[in-house]
């Protein structure tokens, strides 16, 4: 698949933009703070209905305007699918083929993207929350079931936390309702954990191949899903459900003391291991970057395997963060098969010998012009 056209109206610093992209390499060239990252953000938003930079959709609407629109057309095989998201103070709606979708989870998956930015190096050395978000965003594009269970889990988790706080002020309150919420949370949580583990097994397989090539066979990469639920309890959703139920009962007194849910997939983590050592703790910066790059490149082939289509790759100023060897592995992996958007302040930072006839766009204060320098 590839993004054929993009239209922006009052999105960030773009008042009105209509552009047609190439199916291969698209280079977004410009000085800092001109709108390169904003353009990538709009593509990410068109794919996932949310930004990777802010949790507030209001931040995406241009200053002193009340609404924004992001739309585009996605080419798949012999079909072109129009996509559109409208934003306002009242919320947002998403359309596929000009038909509004009743749930955003029905929309996600029409355009699949993989974003690689400097901060993505933190999927290895960052907090567990960063890694959970990584799993949720990437796997969510491949599985509507995962998106559904995640949304339901968040909703029930919010209700359960609110009720636990009520019980703090009223210890003699009805705990039967807490049992009901615990049951619902365990059901959705079991689905999430099981699907995460299956997803990580597949991602691990692809990541190991890439990592072996980059490290020239000197290192072995592996993943560990970190949860209070042991691996022998996690091979079926039924076992995970039972384990979560037991943990909720065990932690109830502490939860009532602290006023929140203390176990569940919203607190789990992923550990990246190189030669059986936690690379976030014991790995060098080079090993951490190789691991992050391996995981990101593996996503491309995994998404192709799961969806039948290669995703669109967004590289936001990431080439400057990679040495020549890792940059070469990255660009070689995507050459001639993945539509790619690269932001850069200079073409000298892009390995020209690896890019076949790129489309170059100059960006200046939210105005985009296609360059003749191609």
UniProtKB/Swiss-Prot annotation:
Subcellular location: Cytoplasm
SUPFAM superfamilies associated with the record: P-loop containing nucleoside triphosphate hydrolases
Cited Pfam families: SMC_N (PF02463)
Keywords: ATP-binding, Cytoplasm, DNA damage, DNA repair, DNA replication, DNA-binding, Nucleotide-binding, SOS response
Amino acids binding ATP: 30-37
Main location class: cytoplasm
Keyword Repeat: no
GO cellular component: cytoplasm
Covalent S-S links between cysteines: none
Presence of keyword Protein biosynthesis: no
GO biological process, one term: DNA synthesis involved in DNA repair
Superkingdom of origin: Bacteria
GO MF terms, alphabetically ordered: ATP binding; single-stranded DNA binding
Alphabetized InterPro entries for the sequence: DNA-binding_RecF, DNA-binding_RecF_CS, P-loop_NTPase, RecF/RecN/SMC_N, RecF_2
Family: Belongs to the RecF family.
Role description: The RecF protein is involved in DNA metabolism; it is required for DNA replication and normal SOS inducibility. RecF binds preferentially to single-stranded, linear DNA. It also seems to bind ATP.
This protein's name: DNA replication and repair protein RecF
Organism annotation: Pediococcus pentosaceus (strain ATCC 25745 / CCUG 21536 / LMG 10740 / 183-1w)
The encoding gene: recF
């Amino acid at each position: 698949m590839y993004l054929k056209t993009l239209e922006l109206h009052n999105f960030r610093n773009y008042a009105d933009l209509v552009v047609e992209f190439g199916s291969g390499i698209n280079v977004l060239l410009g000085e800092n703070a001109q709108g390169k990252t904003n353009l990538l953000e709009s593509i990410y938003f068109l794919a996932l209905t949310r930004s990777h930079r802010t949790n507030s959709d209001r931040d995406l609407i241009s200053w002193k305007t009340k609404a924004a629109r992001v739309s585009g057309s996605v080419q798949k095989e012999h079909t072109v699918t129009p996509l559109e998201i409208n934003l306002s103070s009242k919320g947002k709606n998403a359309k596929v083929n000009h038909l509004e979708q009743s749930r955003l989870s029905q929309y996600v998956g029409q355009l699949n993207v993989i974003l690689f930015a400097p901060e993505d190096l933190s999927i290895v050395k960052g907090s567990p929350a960063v890694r959970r978000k990584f799993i949720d965003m990437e796997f969510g594009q491949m599985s509507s079931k995962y998106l559904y269970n995640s949304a339901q889990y968040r909703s029930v988790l919010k209700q359960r936390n609110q009720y636990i706080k009520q019980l703090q002020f009223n210890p003699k309150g009805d705990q039967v309702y807490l049992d009901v919420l615990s049951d619902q949370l365990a059901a959705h949580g079991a689905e999430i954990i099981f699907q995460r583990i299956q997803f990580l097994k597949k991602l691990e397989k692809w990541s190991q191949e890439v990592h072996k090539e980059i490290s020239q066979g000197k290192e072995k990469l592996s993943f560990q899903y970190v949860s209070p639920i042991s691996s022998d309890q996690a091979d079926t959703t039924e076992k995970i459900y039972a384990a979560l139920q037991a943990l909720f009962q065990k932690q109830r007194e502490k939860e009532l003391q602290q006023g929140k849910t203390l176990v569940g997939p919203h607190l789990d983590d992923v550990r990246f291991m190189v030669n059986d050592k936690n690379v976030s703790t014991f790995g060098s910066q080079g090993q951490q970057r190789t691991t992050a790059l391996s995981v990101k490149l593996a996503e491309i082939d995994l998404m192709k395997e799961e969806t039948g289509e290669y995703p669109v790759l967004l590289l936001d100023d990431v080439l400057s963060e990679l040495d020549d060897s890792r940059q070469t592995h990255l660009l070689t992996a995507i050459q001639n098969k993945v539509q790619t958007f690269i932001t850069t302040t200079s073409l000298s930072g892009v390995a020209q010998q690896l890019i076949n006839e790129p489309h170059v766009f100059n960006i200046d204060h939210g105005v985009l012009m296609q360059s003749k320098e191609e």
